[in-house]
């Protein structure tokens, strides 16, 4: 079957934003204008097509990024048909893993900002993730119809808060309730959308007289940015010649793709204005799969390989999301980087070295699906019924194996114990948690060896609330939840040398003998977390026992001597020891190493580390005193404040253990008018009194 849309006309984009910037509404309008959904779903009444899990509809926030395929030929049908795969990414900080994962599979992104709230804390997190994956992006300033909307203020914040080279592509005509449309600065025409047909049709009009001077100035700014794309254009521009519309657009596209500029559009998705022109900008300025560098991977022989966006190359794809569908079981969303795959084909999961058969392949529209026979380079689709695939796995041609980089997921910072209410719940709970952990790598499940309790860990209170909620709804498991526990860490502050560990047992017949001498030293927190250096000279310990020493120490790292928390940021140097021809064994050296480690750890000034969160509170000015006072009681370090006439943004670093229940307290202090976001920042040494209390509590 031949390709229906040339790959140059694909756009794989993410729509990314802070909570409540109106991202889901924006995505809904995209689906509406591209003709996919006929009734616009409103988030206010919990009926948006993209938010397909029940909790999302209740909480009005987006949790799972659904991938949707839509088609667009331009506002005035000026382009051949383009295929836009929209990946809806969550805006809540507890779900940053989902955002990271979708960033991997996007080629470009639309960053949605609220014209009133501007660049909010979460926007910065998402921005940094987009930088990390070098995703070209454009901005859409939404909610231009709201009181307090100010387009140019948001453009300014993009520059000052995100360091973006933000360049308006449009200016709004009017603002707040007088917002009527936008001026296209390249054409120098005002665009007026027809309210009667929900913005499906529009007219070009002259630029309002009172805006002429401003528009000229901003157009100059835009043309200058285009001219900077090449010396040739710069000469033409400086020589006083006009650049053609075509020259301006292709130069701007080149600079967006190189991540040198961010073009800014605006509108009000809710009022059906501006999304249509933003879609045109997606087609004109964001990359096709062929515009981005080949994806890198690792060949079976550990050399670096790559795959280009071409149907001719061997098949390679990345599984970026696994969702459980009530009707068909597991849906594995995957992005094809190269080659072609047909339903019924068998591929290799190169990470697990297992074969998988692609039974049915579907393309999703929010939560409706359409079966398709094949997918090609650049496509995003979902496979039904793959057996053993986890997010981040590579699915590729059996005869051309490659591992596309594994994604690294952050370590969870918060844990709670869950206990099934009945015996029947117990069996179902194991299954449910296993399923949920497979979908979400930032969520972990383990059994506490001492208490036998099931412990779940995640990225924040909201994250775990939602996991428990899904367990109840999707798997019908009733469970009691314990108090949230903080994931502390242990480390050392000073170096100790020549610490001995000897394991010798002589009990008739063959004995056990292992003897090691190690140094223990602190490592930089930014470093690898653990290193093992073997400096045994002259075979005082035979080579085959060295890995056992390393293993013995690594087993101790899982549960540290202070309070049983994981041990981080230390190095071990093994430099002396002895062995016995008959009695030595791997086990004996493992035990000797663990004895040496415990002895060395207690001498090396061990300390407890606690997770510190980066907390940003936005509050009306009248509550600043109360909010800061309360943060100080929580051992916060307030780093600064930033104010405009509506809100004060407070930047602080607060230990996670002090943040439980903060949402409720903040609501009552500010009558529900403040909001906050937090994300893991670093681990820092816990004060002596806190450490003592934690260690004491662990002994009970």
Swiss-Prot record:
An example Gene Ontology biological process: ribosome disassembly
Signal peptide positions (record): none
tr-type G domain sequence ranges: 8-290
Keywords recorded for this protein, A-Z: Cytoplasm, Elongation factor, GTP-binding, Nucleotide-binding, Protein biosynthesis
UniProt: GTP binding residues: 17-24, 88-92, 142-145
Localization: Cytoplasm
Family from the record: Belongs to the TRAFAC class translation factor GTPase superfamily. Classic translation factor GTPase family. EF-G/EF-2 subfamily.
Name of the protein described by the UniProt record: Elongation factor G
Organism: Haemophilus influenzae (strain PittEE)
